[in-house]
Amino acid sequence: MILIVISSSPVIDNLYEQGIETALNLADAEIEVSVLIEGEFLNCVEENPQCTGAKKLGQCKLYEVSVYSQSKVDLPFVKAIDTANLQQQASKIVVF
């Protein structure tokens, strides 16, 4: 499984979009992929679950990409999980 970690701020730049697109492209190629949100991206989603970053992240549902975070957020498709365990399961980790 490839783990895409999205931690960049959706307010400052669009690097997070590249992370989401990478996850969607991998899923479209039928490669097992999951997304972990943390850092500035997680802070933004926690403060405003309707922000542009959260809406774009919602595309992961269409490709059945699992989305995780360290803490509970107000998005039904994001699951809170122990991130250390998730990172151990990944064969590759890519950070955006």
Model-inferred region functions:
Residues L15-V35:
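Histidine-anchored nucleotide/phosphate-binding helix
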